[in-house]
Amino acid sequence: MHRLALVVATVAYLCAGHAPLQHITGTQRLVQVLIHNRYLAVRSDGTVGGTTYASSLDTVLQRIAIAHGRILLRNAVSCMYVCLDRCGAMYASAALSSDCILNEVMLENNYDVMFKIYNGKKTYVALDNTGNPRRVQLPRQRPLRMMNVYTFIMRIPLNYISVSQCAKPNKVIRHRKLPLVVQTTLNTISIYIITHVTMLFDHVD
């Protein structure tokens, strides 16, 4: 824990002492998020997972309240947001999209859950037994029951103030776009289908 304190203090110093004033968006309380006995790690490569390494900078997060019951969860160093897409995949993004605006419900015994609602289903921030993201999607009114082990969150406050150097987003994009390779593949398939259907009709004529 002393090592983490040193790391967090260093982060706060670097952000406060060496960031241009126009990039400072305000102070945020630092937290760690514990799910299924692992710390939620938000990585700069766009992945989110769990780790037992409590001193990792990937686990130093900012919980930013934007409205009642709605939050942003952001890594304090990389400025990457925790996001959930419509398929239930959890990922990290430097661009703030609607996928990253999370609902938060506080439960008993100091636990809470974070989720998105898509098409009448709740998609939860969740980790499996090995610390990988677990897709948990349930109808809106269905209780978690046995799924609570993967979704219950305990927030651990860190007794430091971080001066954020993350740029304030100018807009919120709608959702995560498909990777370029997927878009290219879909376009190729569409062109192939259209071409062969056209040839078929020409042959019939």
Swiss-Prot record:
Highest taxon in the source lineage: Viruses
Pfam families in UniProt: FGF
GO molecular function: growth factor activity
SMART domains, per the entry: FGF
CDD domains for this protein: beta-trefoil_FGF_Bnl-like
Leader peptide range in chain numbering: 1-17
Gene3D superfamilies: 2.80.10.50
InterPro entries in the record: Fibroblast_GF_fam (IPR002209), IL1/FGF (IPR008996)
Keywords: Growth factor, Signal
Recorded family membership: Belongs to the heparin-binding growth factors family.
Name of this chain's protein: Fibroblast growth factor homolog
Naturally occurring in which organism (per UniProt): Orgyia pseudotsugata multicapsid polyhedrosis virus
Organism phylogeny: Viruses, Viruses incertae sedis, Naldaviricetes, Lefavirales, Baculoviridae
Gene (UniProt): FGF
